[in-house]
């Protein structure tokens, strides 16, 4: 599969996860663990798509910080997107274990907003012929 086709496939998959994030936000429903899992999945797929667009291989990992680091090493300015790495535990730990009572409340609106911004940014790259 070409890098561009791979990126398009990953973005479509990320959009499916993000659709659930939006529905859960709109209806204030579902467990935080499920919400966080779909944020993590959307972000992971978007970061891998971004790397594919750049023609770079990406590690097979759920670790968002590792994916952000690969982009940063390539000179990509990540700004506030990098805070989304906080959702890594939702792919591996909180997918099976509930959040503890000591966990701070999740800011779903902020997570959804940052994920939406990341989605828009990656989709922009797919529409631009020069993907440098």
What residues fall within each predicted segment?
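Terminal alpha-helical segments
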Residues: 1-132
């Amino acid at each position: 599969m070409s890098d561009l086709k791979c990126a398009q496939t990953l973005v479509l998959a990320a959009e499916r996860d993000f659709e659930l994030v939006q529905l859960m936000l709109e209806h204030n429903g579902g467990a935080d663990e499920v919400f966080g899992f779909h944020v993590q999945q959307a972000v992971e797929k978007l970061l891998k798509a971004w790397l594919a667009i750049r023609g770079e291989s990406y590690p097979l990992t759920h670790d968002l910080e590792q994916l952000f680091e690969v982009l940063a090493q390539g000179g990509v300015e990540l700004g506030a997107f990098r805070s989304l790495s906080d959702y890594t535990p939702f792919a591996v730990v909180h997918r099976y274990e509930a959040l503890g009572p000591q966990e701070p409340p999740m800011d779903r609106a902020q997570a959804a907003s940052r994920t939406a911004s990341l989605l828009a940014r990656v989709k922009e790259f797919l529409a631009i012929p020069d993907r440098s």
